[in-house]
Amino acid sequence: MPDSDNDSGGPSNYAGGELSSPREQDRFLPIANVSRIMKKALPANAKISKDAKETVQECVSEFISFITGEASDKCQREKRKTINGDDLLWAMTTLGFEDYVDPLKHYLHKFREIEGERAAASTTGAGTSAASTTPPQQQHTANAAGGYAGYAAPGAGPGGMMMMMGQPMYGSPPPPPQQQQQQHHHMAMGGRGGFGHHPGGGGGGSSSSSGHGRQNRGA
């Protein structure tokens, strides 16, 4: 048979040289994968014939079916639907392939460790992403509750009861700017009207001026 690198998963020969059916071919590993694995064990300039590839293809496919079938029987007896790695290792031991068990146990252990780390990292990343996407409105409300708890609503009277964040509060807020201007104006007027006022006296500067005026008119 001529040498060929055809990796299309060509037909395998069965009883009397008859070609296998398409359904029979479905249970084989892709011949391209088989060829790639075989080449890793050979020198760079080595070649593999087509019949060698097909022989190994059939061999490894049969081995997989053999081990998987034994593990499947175990799962059926235990009324389980999922075959796991431990079931396959048990099947290899039962069928006499103990030499494969120890290295595969080590591989299975490392594989599960890596998967666990990936799951933990994914969970942590999801939590961080959720925290970073907190709506700005909630953050503003939290800041207002913490930093402006003593602020009173405009228009609340002195000593009056105010509501802030749903809680009653008491206090005298600073008057609005307009009210401050009015108070300042009244204070200025009062200061001018009371000029000349003496402690204990009943009259002010304006009263004295009025008296002098009346005297002048009488004269």
From Swiss-Prot:
Q: Write out the entry's keywords from A to Z.
A: Cytoplasm, DNA-binding, Transcription, Transcription regulation
Q: Respond yes or no to whether keyword Transmembrane is given for this record.
A: no
What GO terms fall under cellular component here? CCAAT-binding factor complex; cytoplasm
Instruction: Name the GO terms of the biological process aspect.
Output: regulation of transcription by RNA polymerase II
Q: Where is the composition biased (Gly residues)?
A: 190-206
What Gene3D superfamilies does the entry give? Histone, subunit A (1.10.20.10)
Please indicate which superkingdom the organism of origin belongs to.
Answer: Eukaryota
Similarity field: Belongs to the NFYB/HAP3 subunit family.
Q: How does it assemble?
A: Heterotrimeric transcription factor composed of three components, NF-YA, NF-YB and NF-YC. NF-YB and NF-YC must interact and dimerize for NF-YA association and DNA binding. Interacts with NFYC2, NFYC4 and NFYC6.
Name of the protein: Nuclear transcription factor Y subunit B-8
Give the source species: Oryza sativa subsp. japonica
Q: Which gene encodes it?
A: NFYB8
